[in-house]
């Protein structure tokens, strides 16, 4: 019963962003992934067809990241395969977001960010939250270039070095470098975790 209730609460939280059927399936996937640090394809309690669709969505939304990668540790360099034995992990901030959702039935991105950054000075936490909220109005497809991020930080009165905020957010699973965009354009691009912005109050 407890497991069923947990899935129901997760599905309720996800329903603000996903259709009811997708929210239910994704809730089952997330619930399975929350039980251990890593999860294997065969541990996901879905039909093969649903598993394929949900894994694809989970990767696109950065809920689950394949352990297998090409060159760097960035999210976009990961290799998604659907074969048995493939291992996935959940970024730290996403794990905190969905652990809380499993208990409350709602998404609280600010609480997840504050929790994952709790070992940092209070000023950095406060300004990181402010920066992440403001960026939702400036990035495209949850991606932004470093110069834009610096301009946004300056424009919103953030005094903590934006490079320190970015470095901290990368370690916490809040952001990831975009290696392909950086290589092609000669600029530093970063991806923000999409699920944080499913919470409409995170702004």
Regions found by a protein language model. Name each.
Residues 45-67, 155-172:
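Short amphipathic alpha-helical interaction segments
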Residues 78-119, 189-203:
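Short, amphipathic alpha-helical interaction segments positioned at domain boundaries
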Residues 167, 171-203:
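Alpha-helical oligomerization segments
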Residues 2-49, 97, 101-157:
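Short amphipathic alpha-helical interface segments
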Residues 68-78, 179-187:
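Short, Lys/Arg-rich nucleic-acid/phosphate-binding segment
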Residues 24-27, 52, 56, 91, ...:
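Non-catalytic, well-ordered alpha-helical scaffold segments
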């Amino acid at each position: 019963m407890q497991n069923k209730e947990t899935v129901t609460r997760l599905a309720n939280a996800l329903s603000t962003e996903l259709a009811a059927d997708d929210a239910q399936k994704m809730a089952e996937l997330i619930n399975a992934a929350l039980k251990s640090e890593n999860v294997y394809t065969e541990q996901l309690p879905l039909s093969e067809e649903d598993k394929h669709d949900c894994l694809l969505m989970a990767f696109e939304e950065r809920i689950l990241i394949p352990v297998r990668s090409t060159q760097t540790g960035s999210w976009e360099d990961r290799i998604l395969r659907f074969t048995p034995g493939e291992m996935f992990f959940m970024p730290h901030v996403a794990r905190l977001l969905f652990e809380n959702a499993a208990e409350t039935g709602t998404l609280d991105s600010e609480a997840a960010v504050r929790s994952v950054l709790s070992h940092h000075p209070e000023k950095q936490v406060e300004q990181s939250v402010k920066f992440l909220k403001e960026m939702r109005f400036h990035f495209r497809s949850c991606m932004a270039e470093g110069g834009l991020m610096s301009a946004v930080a300056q424009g919103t009165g953030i005094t903590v070095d934006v490079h320190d905020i970015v470095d901290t957010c990368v370690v916490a699973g809040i952001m990831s470098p975009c290696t392909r965009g950086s290589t092609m354009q000669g600029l530093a691009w970063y991806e923000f975790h999409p699920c944080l912005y499913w919470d409409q109050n995170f702004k």
